């Protein structure tokens, strides 16, 4: 019998801005840990809802929370802490994690969201259980010493038809503790092109963190 899943939608206040989020969690028992899902510029938390990622994570025993980033989706009214393509302060995502009471989470970070996740990942004493970058932007804005200092396990994901995925990998491969999932025939939002492969690879990585 499939495990039951509880889902909800709400907003949180982060640094004076209202951010929308969707959450799925196991219907019974404790969640293993939290997974925070970010998104690219043409997407929102709805992407993870429609793809079934939130549901699959909750069924596997994780608390999955997808936010709409400032200025996008249903957080359109919120002011972003940095212009698009510039690194946001790591304190922004730290404040999101605090507001949602996630504990040390795994962060899934495609494309645009790299501007938020990379400063959080490389901040001294970063409370991050795992990192799943999917062809994120801003990888060239982090220096080698900062990459080398990251102890967080990472699963680097990209489609082999995505030049940006290859470019970001050239930087991300400096993370000392990483695995790579290259999706053949997939483009920039590779998780949309190959959802089954995405979910299998993601759940496998998360299981290794338990």
Curated annotation (Swiss-Prot):
One of its GO terms (cellular component) is cytoplasm. It is found in: Cytoplasm; Nucleus. GO terms for molecular function: hydrolase activity; protein-lysine-acetyltransferase activity. The active site is at residues 111, 162, 188. The modification N-acetylalanine is found at residue 2. It comes from the Eukaryota. Its EC number is 2.3.1.-. Pfam families: Abhydrolase_6 (PF12697). InterPro entries: AB_hydrolase_1, AB_hydrolase_fold. The modification Phosphoserine is found at residue 91. The keyword Acetylation applies. It catalyses: L-lysyl-[protein] + acetyl-CoA = N(6)-acetyl-L-lysyl-[protein] + CoA + H(+). Belongs to the AB hydrolase superfamily. ABHD14 family. PANTHER family: PROTEIN ABHD14B-LIKE, PROTEIN-LYSINE DEACYLASE ABHD14B-RELATED. Acts as an atypical protein-lysine deacetylase in vitro. Catalyzes the deacetylation of lysine residues using CoA as substrate, generating acetyl-CoA and the free amine of protein-lysine residues. Additional experiments are however required to confirm the protein-lysine deacetylase activity in vivo. Has hydrolase activity towards various surrogate p-nitrophenyl (pNp) substrates, such as pNp-butyrate, pNp-acetate and pNp-octanoate in vitro, with a strong preference for pNp-acetate. May activate transcription. This is Putative protein-lysine deacylase ABHD14B. It comes from Pongo abelii. The gene is ABHD14B.
């Amino acid at each position: 019998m499939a495990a039951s899943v509880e889902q909800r939608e709400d907003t949180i206040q982060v640094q004076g801005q209202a951010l929308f989020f969707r959450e799925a969690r196991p219907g019974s028992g404790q969640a293993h840990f939290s997974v925070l899902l970010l998104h690219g510029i043409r997407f929102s938390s709805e992407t993870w809802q429609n793809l079934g990622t939130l549901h699959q994570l909750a069924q596997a025993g994780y608390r999955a929370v997808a936010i709409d980033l400032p200025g996008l989706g249903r957080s359109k009214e919120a002011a972003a802490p940095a212009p698009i393509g510039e690194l946001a302060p790591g304190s922004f995502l730290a404040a999101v994690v605090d507001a949602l009471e996630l504990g040390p989470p795994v962060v899934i970070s495609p494309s645009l969201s790299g501007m938020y996740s990379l400063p959080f990942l490389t901040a001294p004493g970063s409370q991050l259980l795992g990192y799943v970058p999917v062809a994120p932007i801003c990888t060239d804005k982090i220096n080698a010493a900062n990459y080398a200092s990251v102890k967080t396990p990472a699963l680097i994901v990209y489609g082999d038809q995505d030049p940006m995925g290859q470019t970001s990998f050239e930087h991300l491969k400096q993370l000392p503790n990483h695995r790579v999932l290259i999706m053949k025939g997939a483009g920039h939002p590779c998780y949309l092109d190959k959802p089954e492969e995405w979910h299998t690879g993601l759940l496998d990585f998360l299981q290794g963190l338990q």
